[in-house]
Amino acid sequence: MKLNLYVLTPKRIIWDCEVKEIILSTNSGQIGVLPNHAPINTAVDMGPLRIRLLNDQWLTAVLWSGFARIVNNEIIILGNDAELGSDIDPEEAQQALEIAEANLSKAEGTKELVEAKLALRRARIRVEAVNWIPPSN
Amino acid sequence: MSCSHLSTAWSSSALASSASTTRRRSPPRSGLLVRCSLRELRTRIDSVRNTQKITEAMKLVAAAKVRRAQEAVVSSRPFSEALVEVLYNMNQEIQTEDIDLPLTRTRPVKKVALVVLTGERGLCGSFNNNVLKKAETRIDELKQLGLQYTVVSVGKKGNAYFQRRPYIPLERDLEVSSVPTVKDSQAICDLVYSLFVSEEVDKVELLYSKFVSLVRSDPIIQTLLPMSPKGEICDVNGVCVDATEDELFRLTTKEGKLTVEREKVKIETQPFSPVVQFEQDPVQILDALLPLYLNSQILRALQESLASELAARMSAMSSATDNAIELRKNLSIAYNRQRQAKITGEILEIVAGADALAG
């Protein structure tokens, strides 16, 4: 059995292939989706999307909040933006993380603090997506 | 004796010719009557030719960019289609429930935010002026209705315009990149979202140029917030268009000419869907979904506005090129006429000299 996975953003289609399994971050925690999953609607939180390909390889993508719908072995994920792990430059992501940490320590005021925390979280997720090691099985 | 006379005649002719060449005359005073030296005419013709090359190049660049803008709209269609379908299904499933969402909450309107999309550069005919005139008209209407208003300006031309008019309250002026991105639309989306949810304004309207054809684009006003839970798109008069109808413009070549076909695509919504669980509260899910829809609407408006601007620039540069060609032709005629007159004059002088010598 397979799952049809679509990851759509206003800019382009990020993913449009059959997969074996995905692990998705939702607003109420991470969920794993295998074939014949119950129909479900969920809001997607900022976080990684793990994709297990048909050849048992794992890929990582990064989602920035959105919506996911799982019906009849078809997964539609809508988000404002998304990135495949392979498209992220590790050095650039690491630098962005360090810059975000520096900005957080320098932030003054509530608004700046909230923005700095969000930027830091975003940078951290991107770094994790690049450095993630898939489970061996 | 004879040889000496001949030498004198040639010298006299040369002097006259030199005087004629260096004499300066007044600039042209009537339409086609050109009076200036041949050198000045030559310089002017070269200058017009350079201008023509520039305007022609700009026209071709604008045409290429229109095509690219079209591709951007096409590539964002899958997202819009999926979003509308999901929104439709969601509403079917939770129809019986009484949902209170911040983005769909309707209040008595006391203050309106007007988001105005203009271009980043000029040289595109009356594109920017049309949008700004429409904005002024809308502002006057709001004044007559006794409503407060504030303006969110997007694009350099609009920013410059509103900054020169302190009497118009400007909430924010934003600049976008030359090609609309999700980041740009998200910035606008975040701003109008916070304005509306914090109840600073009760209604948000979006003013932009809708791309109709290569020679026409209409500034239209669309209500962004409050939005219908079903995702309908409403104009200021309350006329709603079903969101399942998605208009798409396409740049084609029909009989060797560039034309634009605008077709309506009916997005199919599945008639039956299984009972779907909600991982979170439906309100929370719609809270996540509607901002996506708002963002895609703004992005679409940015893309249409850019396409309109590029089409207007294409037309403007095409007209400028035609004008340059015509002007160059007229100047060439005047140049040749003057050159011919000069040569004729010189010949007459030579003949007169010869006659005098013979006499």
Curated annotation (Swiss-Prot), chain A:
Subcellular location(s) per record = Plastid, Chloroplast thylakoid membrane
GO CC annotations, alphabetized: chloroplast thylakoid membrane; proton-transporting ATP synthase complex
Query: What keywords appear on the UniProt entry?
Result: ATP synthesis, CF(1), Chloroplast, Hydrogen ion transport, Ion transport, Membrane, Plastid, Thylakoid, Transport
Q: Which GO terms describe its molecular function?
A: ATP binding; proton-transporting ATP synthase activity, rotational mechanism
Q: Which domain of life is it from?
A: Eukaryota
What are the BP-aspect GO terms? proton motive force-driven ATP synthesis
What Gene3D superfamilies does UniProt report for this protein, alphabetically? 6.10.140.480, F0F1 ATP synthase delta/epsilon subunit, N-terminal (2.60.15.10)
How would you describe this protein's topology in the membrane? Peripheral membrane protein
One of the Pfam families matching this protein, by short name: ATP-synt_DE_N
InterPro entries, sorted: ATP_synth_F1_dsu/esu (IPR001469), ATP_synth_F1_dsu/esu_N (IPR020546), ATP_synth_F1_esu_C (IPR020547), ATPsynth_dsu/esu_N (IPR036771)
Quaternary assembly: F-type ATPases have 2 components, CF(1) - the catalytic core - and CF(0) - the membrane proton channel. CF(1) has five subunits: alpha(3), beta(3), gamma(1), delta(1), epsilon(1). CF(0) has three main subunits: a, b and c.
UniProt lists the family membership as follows: Belongs to the ATPase epsilon chain family.
What the protein does comes down to: Produces ATP from ADP in the presence of a proton gradient across the membrane.
What is the protein's given name?
Answer: ATP synthase epsilon chain, chloroplastic
Q: What is the native source organism of this protein?
A: Sorghum bicolor
Q: Which gene encodes it?
A: atpE
From Swiss-Prot, chain B:
Q: Where in the cell is it found?
A: Plastid, Chloroplast thylakoid membrane
Q: How does it sit in the membrane?
A: Peripheral membrane protein
| Transit peptide: first to last position | 1-35
Q: Which Pfam families match?
A: ATP-synt
Name the PROSITE patterns on file: ATPASE_GAMMA (PS00153)
**Cysteines joined through disulfide linkages:** C234-C240
The active-site annotation reads C124
- The main place the protein resides is plastid
Q: Report the leader peptide range.
A: none
Q: Which InterPro entries match?
A: ATP_synth_F1_ATPase_gsu, ATP_synth_F1_gsu, ATP_synth_F1_gsu_CS
What is a single cellular component term in the Gene Ontology annotation?
chloroplast thylakoid membrane
Query: Is Magnesium included in the keywords of this UniProt record?
Result: no
Q: Which UniProt keywords apply?
A: ATP synthesis, CF(1), Chloroplast, Disulfide bond, Hydrogen ion transport, Ion transport, Membrane, Plastid, Thylakoid, Transit peptide, Transport
Q: Which domain of life is it from?
A: Eukaryota
> What GO terms describe the biological role, i.e. biological process, of this protein?
proton motive force-driven ATP synthesis
| Keyword Calcium annotated | no
Report a single Gene Ontology molecular function. proton-transporting ATP synthase activity, rotational mechanism
Homology family: Belongs to the ATPase gamma chain family.
What is its biological role? Produces ATP from ADP in the presence of a proton gradient across the membrane. The gamma chain is believed to be important in regulating ATPase activity and the flow of protons through the CF(0) complex. Inceptin is a proteolytic fragment produced by insect larvae that previously ingested the protein. This peptide mediate plant perception of herbivory through the induction of volatile, phenylpropanoid and protease inhibitor defenses such as ethylene, jasmonic acid and salicylic acid for example.
- Assembly mode: F-type ATPases have 2 components, CF(1) - the catalytic core - and CF(0) - the membrane proton channel. CF(1) has five subunits: alpha(3), beta(3), gamma(1), delta(1), epsilon(1). CF(0) has four main subunits: a, b, b' and c.
Recorded protein name is ATP synthase subunit gamma, chloroplastic
Taxonomic classification: Eukaryota, Viridiplantae, Streptophyta, Embryophyta, Tracheophyta
